[in-house]
């Protein structure tokens, strides 16, 4: 496997290292073979979990196979955060990345906040716009989103339901 541009890293409560990278940024200069004729030269899945020794524990991620019942994967992967309940939060900073995603630490989709490709600007309480970072406050179970690439704010949602709380 090859890594594309690495755009996020976090350490969970078990001291595991989580990495998100951009598989679509590998090219012929990275010895990436477009016809995938060798295992060595394929991009890794976007989300990677490592132990402290650098051993790969698992990998997952990418577009949902059924968008009607799934989620909208980021156009450009950007940012990863593992919360106090071991949920993995992801964001993107591509032009259509107006949502954030929540998964279990095994890669099962849980929640999407926002609709991909829709933004109403900095006063929009339903969508983000190229989120810069995510953090969850355990005491209130609120997710704080640094929504600063496309908007200019920090917006807060309920981490379980995705309901808007405040800006």
Describe every region a protein language model picked out.
Residues 1-167:
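Eukaryotic scaffold repeat domains enriched in small/polar residues
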């Amino acid at each position: 496997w090859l890594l594309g541009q690495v755009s996020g890293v976090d350490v969970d409560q078990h001291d595991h290292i989580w990495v998100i990278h951009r598989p679509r940024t590998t090219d012929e200069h990275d010895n990436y073979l477009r016809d995938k004729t060798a295992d060595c030269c394929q991009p890794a899945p976007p989300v990677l979990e490592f132990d402290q020794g650098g051993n790969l524990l698992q990998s997952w991620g990418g577009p949902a196979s059924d968008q009607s019942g799934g989620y909208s994967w980021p156009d450009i992967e950007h940012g990863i955060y593992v919360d106090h309940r071991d949920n993995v939060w992801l964001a993107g900073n591509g032009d259509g990345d107006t949502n954030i995603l929540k998964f279990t630490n095994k890669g099962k989709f849980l929640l999407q906040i926002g609709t991909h490709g829709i933004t109403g600007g900095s006063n929009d309480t339903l969508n983000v716009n190229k989120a810069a970072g995510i953090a969850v406050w355990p005491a209130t179970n609120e997710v704080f989103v640094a929504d600063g690439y496309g908007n200019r704010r920090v917006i807060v949602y309920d981490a379980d339901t995705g309901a808007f709380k405040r800006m």
